[in-house]
């Protein structure tokens, strides 16, 4: 249903514009090409220049314009440019057409056959030309050949050329899908990653077209040149996986400790060395086919339109079949081998003739084809990489999906689910930490009956809501975008040495797990939830930024019950203060109150939850008496026990995790921009900003910088005056200060600053026990 909706949306919003854009090239060719023998050269040149412009547009749109202007203004700019092109075309149409240039071949004197007829430019001229030719043929003796068909290749050859035209579009777009998936295994997968691959492919196609324009000037047989191009492209494709493995050290993540620009240059260099040879050579095939069309051409526009149509249909089918069938069924390397095989078969089918040169060319194609089929084994190439620092990690099972590669790995820390080699969705070794993402909001709001989880991952967090300790929970709905993640979780997380880590998520009648885009589900459903719990999302990954936008927060707010709350988990070890402040500012803009809660107190690995509250909400009161448990937890302890403290966790002591009221301290975030669908600041700025720090001083908002931010918030709005805590006792309101002191003690302890650690410990004990 989701796919059908997307196809419908694309068809209605993009098809009309793309249909009209498809007319440009044939019409321009009809205007510019006045000589039959110049058709291949000029049309290839036009195609190359047009594609070079596309590469420039992709670079600007992929790297700069959305951040500078926003999507809407970028679209307006594109419309203005299109109108400018239309105006220029209209002005050109007012000028007289250039005079027809006759064929460059030396004409036979006074013979009708030797003259190359002028190329018609209008429908009336074409019809007149056809009537004249028909009249000439009727007057010509039967044994005299026609001027148009005398040098034409046989019909079978024409069909092979059209098939190669189709394959050119099919192969290049299918390969672009494969190349993108290939690099998703070793790159951070931000919007810039995909823009880089697209720009490199477009530049190579443009250069290939310009090379083709030069080849069209040669006197060599076009079919022989085509065969050699296809053969060279297939050879480059065969080498691509091995070059990729060499440059990425067997698929390890490509990273740089330098600046943003140095990292982008590293990506461009790695991607160009890997795919540019294949893309450049294969990019010459389609424009060079225009050279072979010269013998058949009656009208430049008609021929260009025919070739472009066949090539584009192939491109559409290549992207669709590769994305939805080949990757799922064959995987990256086998799919690349099949596409290489198709190119080699096409080269063998081209009608070269039976002279020695042609036979040698065919023999070489056959040898390369056999080597590709039998000597090279794609199964020997790795599909994902493991953590080089965890040498004991081993891969248990892999699923190659259309949009990512999902793997289950096992190591000393437990069983993990990963996406694209390096992005971990969770592990049995982090069971308690993941479960806390459900426990914490349910301890704050113990009367919760219904929850929605945006993201499933291992299933531990969503399943945590079904724990018997949360006796009021009646409904849990969880959405996961990647179906293979659900498969992995069902298979490996429900029976971990006999223990169901998901808490019965896949068989409890209260739970529903959907393979669906969580954001789209919240926009479309009419269901209401007491808690909408959004998982951790890496902010710089492509698509993740949309889960931090104002529009998403607004649609989530609409799905809350009158007393419901929205919970957004944030990995501070992947956020700079800039990104955190943008997200905080955006949530403050949507929700009446926004509070911040710690997930843990481990310096360097901090996670927080931002909870969006609706108007008039306060935290519910708690009548649990935890006094004895609190005293027992610290009895006889000192700063050396910081890492071993077992503090009680219940609805009373949960305020220990409270970081403060962000709405009351909104002055700290007012200078930061909003993150919106139109201006996706997080998605485009996060990959840049975190590379501004040096290698020995990470820019993440963890440790002391985060503790300092909490101190600022609690200074502006002390817990004793916090409107969200009015239902809590005076002593209980001191718990947030105890949490801040405890976190500070952990930070100073890691620095081995004994005096500062002791001071923070003393402050923690005072606030924890509510004694002065």
Predicted regions: what they are:
Residues 1-617, 622, 626, 735, ...:
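Alpha-helical transmembrane segments of multi-pass membrane proteins
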Residues 515, 771-772:
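Short, solvent-exposed mixed-charge patches
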């Amino acid at each position: 249903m989701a796919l059908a909706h997307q196809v419908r949306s694309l068809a209605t919003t993009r098809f009309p514009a793309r249909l009209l854009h498809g007319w440009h090239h044939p019409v321009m060719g009809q205007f510019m090409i006045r000589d039959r023998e110049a058709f291949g050269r000029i049309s290839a040149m036009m195609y190359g220049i047009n594609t070079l412009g596309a590469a420039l547009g992709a670079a600007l749109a992929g790297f700069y314009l959305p951040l500078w202007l926003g999507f809407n203004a970028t679209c307006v700019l594109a419309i203005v440019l299109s109108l400018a092109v239309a105006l220029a075309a209209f002005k050109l149409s007012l000028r007289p057409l250039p005079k027809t240039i006759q064929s460059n071949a030396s004409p036979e004197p006074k013979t009708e056959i030797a003259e190359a007829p002028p190329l018609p430019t209008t429908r009336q001229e074409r019809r007149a030309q056809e009537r004249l030719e028909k009249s000439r043929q009727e007057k010509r003796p039967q044994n005299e050949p026609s001027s148009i068909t005398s040098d034409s290749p046989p019909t079978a050859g024409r069909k092979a050329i059209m098939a190669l035209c189709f394959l050119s579009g099919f192969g290049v777009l299918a390969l672009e899908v494969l190349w993108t998936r290939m690099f998703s295994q070793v790159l951070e997968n931000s919007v810039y990653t995909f823009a880089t691959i697209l720009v490199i492919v477009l530049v190579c196609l443009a250069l290939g077209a310009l090379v083709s324009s030069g080849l069209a000037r040669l006197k060599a047989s076009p079919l022989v040149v085509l065969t050699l191009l296809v053969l060279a492209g297939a050879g480059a494709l065969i080498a691509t996986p091995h070059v990729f493995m060499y440059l990425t050290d067997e698929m390890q993540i490509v990273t740089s400790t330098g600046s943003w620009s140095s990292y982008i240059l590293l990506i461009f260099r790695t991607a160009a060395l890997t795919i540019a040879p294949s893309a450049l050579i294969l990019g010459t095939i389609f424009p060079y086919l225009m050279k072979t069309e010269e013998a058949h051409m009656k009208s430049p526009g008609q021929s260009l339109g025919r070739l472009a149509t066949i090539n584009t249909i192939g491109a559409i089918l290549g992207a669709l079949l590769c994305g939805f069938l080949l990757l799922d069924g064959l995987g990256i390397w086998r799919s690349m081998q099949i596409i290489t095989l198709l190119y080699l078969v096409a080269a063998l089918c081209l009608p070269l003739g039976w002279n020695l040169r042609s036979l040698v060319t065919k023999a070489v194609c056959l040898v390369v084809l056999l080597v590709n089929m039998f000597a090279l084994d794609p199964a020997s190439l790795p599909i994902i990489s493991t953590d080089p620092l965890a040498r004991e990690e081993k891969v248990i099972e892999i699923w190659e999906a259309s949009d990512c590669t999902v793997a289950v790995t096992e190591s000393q820390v437990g069983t993990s689910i990963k996406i694209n080699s390096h992005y971990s969705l969770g592990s049995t070794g982090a069971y308690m930490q993941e479960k806390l993402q459900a426990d914490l909001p349910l301890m704050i709001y113990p009367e919760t009956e219904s929850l929605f989880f945006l993201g499933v991952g291992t299933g531990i967090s969503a399943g945590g809501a079904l724990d018997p300790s949360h006796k009021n929970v009646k409904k849990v709905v969880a959405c996961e975008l990647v179906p293979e993640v659900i498969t992995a979780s069902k298979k490996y997380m429900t029976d971990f040495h006999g223990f169901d880590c998901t808490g019965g998520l896949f068989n409890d009648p209260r739970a529903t797990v959907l393979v669906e885009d969580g954001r789209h589900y919240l926009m479309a459903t009419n269901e209401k939830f007491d808690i909408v719990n959004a998982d951790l999302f890496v902010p710089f990954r492509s698509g993740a930024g949309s889960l931090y936008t104002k529009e998403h927060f607004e649609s989530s707010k609409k799905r809350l019950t009158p007393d419901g709350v929205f919970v957004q988990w944030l990995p501070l070890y992947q956020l700079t203060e800039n990104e955190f402040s943008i997200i905080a500012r955006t949530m403050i803009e949507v929700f009446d109150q926004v509070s911040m809660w710690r997930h843990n107190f481990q310096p360097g690995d901090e996670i927080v939850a931002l909870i969006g509250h609706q108007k008039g909400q306060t935290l519910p009161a708690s009548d649990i008496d935890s006094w004895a448990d609190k005293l027992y937890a610290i009895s006889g302890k000192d700063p050396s026990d910081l890492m071993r403290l077992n503090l009680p966790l219940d609805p009373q002591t949960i305020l220990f995790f409270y970081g403060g009221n962000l709405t009351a301290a909104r002055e700290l975030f007012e200078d930061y921009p909003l993150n919106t669908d139109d201006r996706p600041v997080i998605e485009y700025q996060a990959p840049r900003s975190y590379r501004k720090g040096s290698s020995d001083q990470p820019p993440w908002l963890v440790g002391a910088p985060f503790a300092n931010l909490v101190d600022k918030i609690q200074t502006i709005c002390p817990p004793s005056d916090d409107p969200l805590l009015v239902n809590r006792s005076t002593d209980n309101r001191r718990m947030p200060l105890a949490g801040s002191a405890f976190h500070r003690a952990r930070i100073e302890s890691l620095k081995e600053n004994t005096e500062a650690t002791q001071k923070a410990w003393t402050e923690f004990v005072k606030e924890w026990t509510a004694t002065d």
